[in-house]
């Protein structure tokens, strides 16, 4: 492993999708090599990011999440080859008990300009699904929300792509480094460094 640097402008803890996507975007502002350091106790994609299902969708009840996901889908679309992203869309196929909630999701998708189709009624839903899967047989379906964007990605490959994009911009990704605590200013609670099992790295932001 490369020796832990003594200091950095930004230290990011964790080499999953949150840590590496943050590093990648911050590297557009912090352009000097070594400005940003990512500390990962094992390997990139070793945690939840490496075992997630990989579905990319905008199917959430919270309005703020829908706007965030609409933005995130555009990031996946920016480099599908590198991210191993497959833009096949997303289907929510529901019984009557979910009709009202799914209709609400559709209306809010429409309000932010996120392309989707909402099919209502058992007969129309069956016909719509048979147009996609000619052997469709499910009964009791009264609504179908078809998001035309979204799809799925191979998550470990996606994380490695984020790592590559980050390091290409000068980010240092330090693996096998366990964070043990934080160094704080003498007269404040402001963090001035990150303590690890490999030493202390001074920083401006964590």
Language-model-derived ranges and their functions:
Residues 2-5, 85, 200:
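Short, flexible hinge/linker loops that cap or flank conserved catalytic cores
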Residues 3-18, 37:
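Beta1/beta-strand and adjacent pyrophosphate-binding region of the FAD-binding site
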Residues 20-24, 160:
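Short, hydrophobic alpha-helix immediately C-terminal to the catalytic nucleophile
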Residues 23, 27, 165:
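Gly/Ala-rich phosphate-binding loop of Rossmann-like dinucleotide-binding domains
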Residues 27-49:
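Glycine-rich FAD pyrophosphate-binding loop
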Residues 34-36, 116-117, 206:
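Hydrophobic anchor at the start of a short beta-strand
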Residues 53-132, 141:
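Dinucleotide-binding Rossmann-like beta1-alpha1 core, especially the glycine-rich loop
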Residues 145-205:
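Helical element adjacent to the flavin cofactor pocket in flavoenzyme catalytic cores
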């Amino acid at each position: 492993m490369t020796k832990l640097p003594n200091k950095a402008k930004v230290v990011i803890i964790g080499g999953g999708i949150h840590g590496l996507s943050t590093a990648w975007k911050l590297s557009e502002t912090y352009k000097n090599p070594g400005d940003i350091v990512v500390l990962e106790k094992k390997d990139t994609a070793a945690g939840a990011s490496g075992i997630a299902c990989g579905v990319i969708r905008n199917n959430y009840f919270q309005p703020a999440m829908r706007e965030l996901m609409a933005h995130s889908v555009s990031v996946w679309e920016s480099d599908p080859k590198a991210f191993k992203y497959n833009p096949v869309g997303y289907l929510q196929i529901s019984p009557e008990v979910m009709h009202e909630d799914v209709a609400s999701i559709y209306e809010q998708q429409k309000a932010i300009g996120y392309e989707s189709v909402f099919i209502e009624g058992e007969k129309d839903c069956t016909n719509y699904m048979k147009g996609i899967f000619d052997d469709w047989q499910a009964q009791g379906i009264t609504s179908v929300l078809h998001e035309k964007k979204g799809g799925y990605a191979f998550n470990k490959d996606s994380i490695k792509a984020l790592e590559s994009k980050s390091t290409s911009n000068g980010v240092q990704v330090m693996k096998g480094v366990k964070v043990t605590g934080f160094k704080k200013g003498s007269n404040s609670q402001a963090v001035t460094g990150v303590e690890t099992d490999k030493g202390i790295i001074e920083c401006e932001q964590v």
